[in-house]
Amino acid sequence: MSGLGIMVLTLLLLVFMATSHQDAGEKQATQRDAINVRRRRSITRRVDEECNEYCDDRNKECCGRTNGHPRCANVCFG
């Protein structure tokens, strides 16, 4: 194989290695973001369930929380 052929193969190998490292970083960041989203959803869901149970006992709708306490109303605005 000529010197030019070896140089071309080496260049292709270097380009492949560089792009594979970039993809790994993006994949890792995507997985980390997905874990954070799952944690937020589980926390939000638990809070919503508590609020819904509290307001259902009073025959009202849960409109979220104010200062850590469930906010109940007949109709939620906003």
Swiss-Prot record:
Disulfide bonds: 51-63, 55-72, 62-76
Annotated Gene Ontology cellular component terms: extracellular region
Propeptide: 25-44
Tissues showing expression: Expressed by the venom duct.
A Pfam family hit: Conotoxin
Signal peptide interval: 1-24
Modified residues (Phenylalanine amide): 77
Keyword tags: Amidation, Cleavage on pair of basic residues, Disulfide bond, Knottin, Neurotoxin, Secreted, Signal, Toxin
Localization annotation: Secreted
Record flagged with keyword Ribonucleoprotein: no
A single MF term (Gene Ontology): toxin activity
Spans through the membrane: none
InterPro entries (UniProt xref): Conotoxin
Signal found in the keyword field: yes
Chief location: secreted
Assigned protein family: Belongs to the conotoxin O3 superfamily.
Domain text: The presence of a 'disulfide through disulfide knot' structurally defines this protein as a knottin. The cysteine framework is VI/VII (C-C-CC-C-C).
Protein name: Conotoxin TsMSGL-11
Originating organism: Conus tessulatus
